[in-house]
Amino acid sequence: MIGSPFLAGRDRYERVMEGWVDSGHGEAFTHTVQITDPDGGVEVSLVCTPSPGYEVRAAGARVRSGAADPGIAADFPDLAGTRMVGGFGKRLAELCGVRSGAVLFVDAGIEVARLARQVTKLPAAAIAGLDPGDAVACWRLDTTGWVDLPDSCFTYSPAGHALFGTRPVSTPMVPTLYSPPPGAPKIFTRKKVARLVLTARRLHLFHSMHDNVHGFDLHYEVDLDRGVIVAADSVTSRLPYAGICNEPQARIKSLLEQPADAQLRKRIQSLIGGSSGCAQLYDLTADLLKLLSLPVS
């Protein structure tokens, strides 16, 4: 049976994430994420090094509202020394356990790791003379500043790179994201809103994400009687490389008539993710599926 523990006793659920990055005076950044839903709110703040280390230098958290266990927040400093790479989500889950509010704290930590992939600290000489509108130059800086970008999505694949020079490509990337001034506050800000709406025998899933370089608004509709996705739509108002990032967005339609089962979480990796897909489209969809209880086929 398709459902969601977050819809228990209600037909609508909304979760809001707000995150931002402050540039420290050394090599590290401070990433702060707040997540709020009808049952409470939490905040996680990690001081981390940029790519390639992604090392947590200091960690803190707090309960902002609701019944989340403050003991989880008290344990967050134990993350110091952890790297935000493969296995970080498991480390967060182990830290938080099954205590009240653990889900929000874990998800906030994961969002911090995602913020860390949006900013870096290259030498000032690397951005000297950079024209913010020079998409090719920004793309090259991307693959220099973040070691995990190559082949992470279509744009950073050889096929995506080959499209430069064949069509107009624009970018909102700016020098501050590559080499920010020491102590600069909120050099990158992000807001995400996930929403579940139950309407008769249809379950609507919404997820939006807006930040300095992305603008996504996703909608899926699940027919609960048939157990399949009957609508899949996305509006992209801002992309890191408009003209190239647009290419994989149509892959969202590959989810039409897909069974809404537990295996869908794995199938979307090849349907909308990987080197032929879009990492943000995949993450936004995967996060919606995490909110659901899905049957095993």
Question: What residue spans do the PLM features occupy?
Answer:
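Short, compositionally biased leader-like segments
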Residues: 165-203
